[in-house]
Amino acid sequence: MEEKQNNKSLQTQLYYWGNTPTEQDYYNLQGIKSTKSFFTSPRNLTLFTRSWLPSAKTPPRGIIFMVHGYGNDISWTFQATPIQLAKNGFACFALDLEGHGQSQGLKAYVPNVDFVIDDCLSFYNFVLTQNPEFQDLPKFLYGESMGGAICLLIHLKSPSMFNGAILIAPMCKISDKVRPRWPIPQFLTILAKFAPTLAIVPTADLLDKSVKVPEKKIIGGMNPNRYVGKPRLGTVLELLRVTDYVSSKLCDVNLPFLILHGSADVVTDPEVSRELYQLAKSKDKTLKIYEGMMHSLLFGETDENVEIVRSDILAWLNDRC
């Protein structure tokens, strides 16, 4: 009985609305508005989307387009960040990427990141078209892990659209600590030509390597939309291709950015974040490396550490709005 009660308590924490009857009641108590819907991309893919907006009494000071990481989605732990940002005056929008969350596609299969970039840009332009009052507001990208790499690719494809980017442990290069060793990559490359959706790539559990607090590992594992299988061959090869490309284009990055990374991150490499900071053309650039923190900075750390990271994000945004 006690174990069931603990599990129920964890589930309640995860949905962020405590003892309030519904999710919408929780948003009301937080003083924000939230919507969810489906968006059809130009390639006719059905993608699940959410928004988190300041209350009607508080006109937004800026727009943030958010991108989640590999195997994650926008409806579970991810939304704690846009909720806080909306409470501080920022209109936040996000979609579940292809093969993730409630969007169409084989689970955790991303055959071509270039198509994902087009999906994101199409959705962001749709949001701006439907909300002309947002046109003159500062527009920011926000990406976690794989989402950080996608934000950089979005910027490289549309360099004048955004006023800045917040990159949380960006996957500019897959860490050698989780990258498959020779001769596995060579063998998998050959096999992927015949069976790209095969989920057999040997890697450690990313949840275990990302989240520091044991209780939060339980919460993260309860996500019904979380992908728990091994990475698919085609996805891994595509992420290797994309991160190799991004790491070769760091010197072309030319927008204001904030990079936040944990020194103890073994999923994405903080050294590559340092390299991005050093090589980027951007005149307005900030790098913060948090000593001892792991990959999941905005959920998996202690509440005190999460608040430090949130405060740094808000301070950076406030200075630019």
Q: What are the language-model segments listed below?
A:
Residues 70-83:
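The serine-hydrolase catalytic nucleophile loop
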Residues 74-76, 101-138, 304-308:
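Catalytic nucleophile-loop/oxyanion-hole region of alpha/beta-hydrolase
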Residues 82-105:
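Conserved alpha/beta-hydrolase
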Residues 253, 259-261, 265:
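Short beta-strand/loop motif that positions the catalytic acidic residue
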Residues 291-321:
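Catalytic active-site module of serine/aspartate enzymes centered on a nucleophile-bearing elbow/loop
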